[in-house]
UniProtKB/Swiss-Prot annotation:
Gene Ontology MF annotations: rRNA (uridine-2'-O-)-methyltransferase activity
Catalytic activity annotation: uridine(2552) in 23S rRNA + S-adenosyl-L-methionine = 2'-O-methyluridine(2552) in 23S rRNA + S-adenosyl-L-homocysteine + H(+)
Any single Gene Ontology cellular-component annotation: cytoplasm
Family recorded in the similarity comment: Belongs to the class I-like SAM-binding methyltransferase superfamily. RNA methyltransferase RlmE family.
Residues given in the record as S-adenosyl-L-methionine binding sites: G66, W68, D86, D102, D127
InterPro entries cross-referenced by the UniProt entry: RNA_methyltr_RlmE, RNA_MeTrfase_FtsJ_dom, rRNA-MeTfrase_E, SAM-dependent_MTases_sf
Leading EC class: transferase
Name of the protein described by the UniProt record: Ribosomal RNA large subunit methyltransferase E
Entry keyword annotation includes Nuclease: no
Transmembrane segments: none
Keywords: Cytoplasm, Methyltransferase, rRNA processing, S-adenosyl-L-methionine, Transferase
Keyword rRNA-binding carried by entry: no
Native source organism of the sequence: Halorhodospira halophila (strain DSM 244 / SL1) (Ectothiorhodospira halophila (strain DSM 244 / SL1))
Region spans: Disordered: 1-24
Length: 212
């Protein structure tokens, strides 16, 4: 019989699944009906920083499976608007306009503009992460590339009092990215909610009030 030593990759995968299933935030998210544990991270940031109000317009980049949009839609209410966009399919959510598109393309941007119907954007959200290979030399640049795409989108669509919340990872490129946000926004805050795994390099940057 093959042992874990002989099949390290498979055993590592099993260990990750086991940690995921035993995670109290995963269990809580399921019990509360959220599509992903990421909703609990956003809820914690909202409770601390007061992001969402009725009537706001929010764009959720890389939205699938929809945990963030699911949380935000009732907060902004019927007077608000949530536009979710992803290359992956996403099951419909009440109060959410889903675009199956790539926001980094001209076609995707035009789709967002049509969905907004001329309304200014109050908040841009990005919980995107690349498909991880396990090799930091590959994964970190890919993650920072997604964050930079999201920042460019926010710079194009946010109004002057808007907020940009983006997931990034400590490592190469992080300091430069944060420095760029500091030049482009009035304030940049770091947030690591309890629902983020303690050993993860994941952190959320909340950039408030575009200045350029």
């Amino acid at each position: 019989m093959a042992t874990c030593r002989r099949r390290r990759r498979g055993c590592n995968s099993q260990a990750r699944r086991s940690r995921h299933e035993s995670d109290p935030f995963v269990r809580r998210a399921r019990a509360e009906g959220w599509r992903s544990r990421a909703a609990l991270k956003l809820e914690a940031i909202d409770q601390r920083d007061g992001l969402f109000r009725p009537g706001q317009v929010v764009v959720d980049l890389g939205a699938a499976p929809g945990g963030w949009s699911q949380l935000v839609a009732p907060k902004v209410g019927s007077a608000g608007r949530v536009v979710a966009i992803d290359l992956l399919e996403m099951d419909p959510l009440p109060g959410v306009t889903f675009l199956h598109a790539d926001f980094s393309t001209d076609e995707g941007l035009r789709a967002v503009e049509r969905a907004l119907e001329g309304r200014p954007v109050d908040i841009v959200l990005s919980d995107m992460a690349p498909n991880l290979t396990g090799h930091n030399a590959v994964d970190q640049p890919a993650a920072m590339g997604l964050a930079e795409l999201a920042a460019d989108f926010a710079g194009q669509f946010l109004h002057k009092n808007g907020d940009f919340l983006v997931k990034v990872f400590h490592g190469e490129g992080f300091d430069a990215f944060r420095g760029d946000l500091t030049r482009r926004f009035s304030r940049v805050l770091s947030r690591k909610p309890d629902a983020s795994r303690s050993g993860s390099r994941e952190v959320y940057l909340l950039a408030r009030g575009p200045t350029v």
